[in-house]
């Protein structure tokens, strides 16, 4: 695998989507994998940009055709990652970032043990509650379910290589960029990127 595969997970409301968007604006070498989902688009979202929005029967057909690297049901909706797209990007030496949940991260790392796991934590449950409430898109019942799910998800933080606490957005972004840049300087990444140099020098 020539490119690095980053798996970024977080409970809903931890700021993962914002952090990933800002990272992609500053690190042009990282390519975002756009997941398929049966969730309805939120205001401002576009098909093919935030997600590939599909109906549940189509998603189930894609599962049957084994087109997903990973897939999971989260909050009553399905999410999945295209297996072929990921493999093609990595083979071409491109870094890929997956923005998925912990269940998907487990599936990905079973197939790609060298994938780099990053978990985003909120600074407190109180702040997480404030962020979810402030969205104004979910009912109180949905928010309660998301908070309960968040607590369950955060129990899996030990399965990841890096943990970033998103208290101050700028600092969290610096931390995420540091993970990406350091991973690009690992022996395996440098050897794949500069194979001819390593053959001559070592």
UniProtKB/Swiss-Prot annotation:
Domain of life: Bacteria
GO cellular component: cytosol
Lineage: Bacteria, Pseudomonadati, Pseudomonadota, Betaproteobacteria, Rhodocyclales
One Gene Ontology molecular-function label: guanylate kinase activity
Gene3D superfamilies per UniProt: Guanylate Kinase phosphate binding domain (3.30.63.10), P-loop containing nucleotide triphosphate hydrolases (3.40.50.300)
Enzyme kind, highest EC tier: transferase
Record's function text: Essential for recycling GMP and indirectly, cGMP.
Main location (coarse class): cytoplasm
Enzyme Commission number(s): 2.7.4.8
Positions that bind ATP: 10-17
Localization of this protein: Cytoplasm
Recorded family membership: Belongs to the guanylate kinase family.
InterPro entries: GK/Ca_channel_bsu, Guanylate_kin-like_dom, Guanylate_kinase, Guanylate_kinase_CS, P-loop_NTPase
Keyword terms of this UniProt record: ATP-binding, Cytoplasm, Kinase, Nucleotide-binding, Transferase
Reaction equation(s) it catalyzes: GMP + ATP = GDP + ADP
Guanylate kinase-like domain location: 3-181
Protein name: Guanylate kinase
């Amino acid at each position: 695998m020539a490119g690095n595969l980053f798996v970024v997970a977080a409970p809903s409301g931890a700021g993962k989507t914002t952090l990933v968007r800002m990272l992609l604006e500053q690190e042009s070498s990282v390519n975002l994998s756009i997941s398929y989902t049966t969730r309805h688009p939120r205001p401002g979202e576009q098909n093919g940009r935030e997600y590939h929005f599909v109906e549940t029967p189509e998603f189930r057909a894609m599962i049957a055709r084994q087109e997903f690297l990973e897939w999971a049901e989260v909050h009553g909706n399905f999410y999945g990652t295209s297996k072929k797209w990921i493999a093609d990007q990595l083979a071409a030496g491109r870094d890929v970032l997956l923005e998925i949940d912990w269940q998907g991260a487990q599936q990905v790392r079973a197939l790609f043990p060298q994938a780099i796991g990053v978990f985003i934590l909120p600074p407190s449950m109180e702040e997480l509650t404030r962020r979810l409430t402030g969205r104004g898109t979910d009912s109180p019942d949905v928010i309660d379910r998301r908070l309960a799910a968040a607590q369950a998800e955060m129990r899996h933080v030990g399965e990841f290589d890096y943990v970033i606490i998103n208290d101050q957005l700028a600092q969290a972004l610096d931390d995420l960029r540091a993970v990406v840049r350091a991973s690009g300087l690992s022996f395996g990444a440098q050897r794949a990127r500069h194979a001819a140099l390593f053959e001559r020098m070592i």
